[in-house]
């Protein structure tokens, strides 16, 4: 089984200085390979997630925004095949949960309604997403699919509006705990044939440091404190394929038997 766990906006800038308080990340870095994945493309979420699971560059897939001409982009508007389409056609058992290359985030062969239409913007919704995505992912793990892809989105919004605050670490600790439940409490990583990829679509930094502004400085949710950085997170375990760019996730999954 291959499990790809996406953590939108996860960054080593928060994790590395706080390894003593993030037991799951600390444990993963002892048993797997942990490093930064430096994006050569713009750290724009819909584009990066799309390329990650289609194998296409931004120039090839042309998907840069959640909305075009005032309308939300839908899966059927996109002229690419994703890894789950290919593997499903080949007869593989594939489950995909909450991947945010569109709004609301996309699921495949899974019945799931994203929290807050996929844009959780307050503490209640962040708690709800964390609980519901964890619960559903754990349920899907018991089905033993050939490929499971699942994504948490909450850290992106939290960091946009709370970057530099202790509040951000509080949420990393909550996410760290849930990842531990998925990977260690279930025994997933005890099975050596199981392969794991944990990846973010970008890192994070202060608003002034960001090379790309992804949200207005002021919004109904508050003033932006942080924004996307090109240094994404990557953790792999039991995987030999070298990942140097987001698109390599597609090829790693396509080449694994």
Task: Please tell me what each predicted stretch does.
Residues 1-257:
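Feature captures the catalytic ectodomains and active-site-proximal regions of enzymes
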